[in-house]
């Protein structure tokens, strides 16, 4: 079964909820990444000098990751696959020596952040599955661009 319009709607609405508290949710996202994989700190220029804290770079990067995942949901419904609009994403991930386990860490952090952003009453298996599917589509496209 492919990605559904209902899953796209779930990702879209929860993305809007995530954005309502972007500063806090961005810090949470990177805090979870570093809790799972402390060595990932050196992969992000805005984390090298300190841990996650409110900063324009941190917020911009978190918003980009979540927006790309939301866009992946839209593409999966429309055409069944994700095509990167930014061709440099593959090269950047190669330069940072990103490997499969890093994608797993980011997915876990993304899911924990969405869960926190929407709250326990809105979080569901369907919402988790929708975000997982969208992120997996994005990760597949990035890995393909990495060569």
From Swiss-Prot:
Compartment(s) where it occurs, according to its Swiss-Prot or TrEMBL record: Cytoplasm, Cytosol; Nucleus
Pfam families xref list: Globin (PF00042)
Coiled-coil regions listed in the entry: none
Source domain of life: Eukaryota
Residues recorded with modification Phosphoserine: 45
One GO cellular component term: host bacteroid-containing symbiosome
Biological role: Leghemoglobin that reversibly binds oxygen O(2) through a pentacoordinated heme iron. In root nodules, facilitates the diffusion of oxygen to the bacteroids while preventing the bacterial nitrogenase from being inactivated by buffering dioxygen, nitric oxide and carbon monoxide, and promoting the formation of reactive oxygen species (ROS, e.g. H(2)O(2)). This role is essential for symbiotic nitrogen fixation (SNF).
UniProt similarity note: Belongs to the plant globin family.
Protein name: Leghemoglobin 3
Gene Ontology terms, MF aspect: heme binding; metal ion binding; oxygen binding; oxygen carrier activity
Modified sites of kind Nitrated tyrosine: 30, 135
Induction: Accumulates in developing root nodules upon inoculation with the symbiotic M.loti strain MAFF303099.
Assembly with partners or alone: Monomer.
